[in-house]
Swiss-Prot record:
A molecular-function term among this protein's GO annotations: structural constituent of ribosome
Alphabetically ordered keywords of this record: Ribonucleoprotein, Ribosomal protein, RNA-binding, rRNA-binding
Name of the protein this chain belongs to: Large ribosomal subunit protein uL23
Cellular component GO terms, alphabetical: ribonucleoprotein complex; ribosome
Family stated for the protein in its record: Belongs to the universal ribosomal protein uL23 family.
Disulfide bonds: none
InterPro entries per the UniProt record, alphabetical: Nucleotide-bd_a/b_plait_sf, Ribosomal_uL23-like, Ribosomal_uL23/eL15/eS24_sf
GO-annotated biological processes: translation
């Protein structure tokens, strides 16, 4: 994966939130991967550079990124049939035995 630089605003658009569930916790303990909800138009290199930029103060380096496009489920609202939006999630592996502290986010440097 090549390195690209993106703005802080784009980094926050790419990474929406960490996925916190029983399954994601199990995967994090077993395979040392962290799961994120990401923007549908983001690619692997953007996801990698966004994570490294958001958690730059913790010196986080990404080893690999795997992406899954998830189809929205069909839901019924009374007699009407609707559909939830499609979304994308990313499985991120970090170099070494690093862990991300989600409370420590510094995007802009103090001048």
């Amino acid at each position: 994966m090549r390195n690209i630089t993106i703005s802080s605003e784009r980094a926050l658009e790419v990474i929406k939130a960490p996925q916190i569930s029983e399954k994601s916790t199990f995967i994090a303990e077993k395979t040392k991967q962290i799961i994120f909800y990401v923007s549908r138009d983001a690619n692997k290199t953007e996801i990698k550079s966004a994570i490294e930029q958001i958690w730059r103060s913790q010196n986080i380096q990404v080893k690999s990124v795997q992406v899954v496009n998830v189809k929205g489920k069909k839901k019924r609202f009374g007699r009407y049939l609707g559909q939830k939006s499609d979304w994308k999630k990313a499985f991120v592996s970090l170099k070494g035995d690093r862990e991300i502290d989600f409370t420590d986010v510094k995007l802009f440097e103090d001048k």
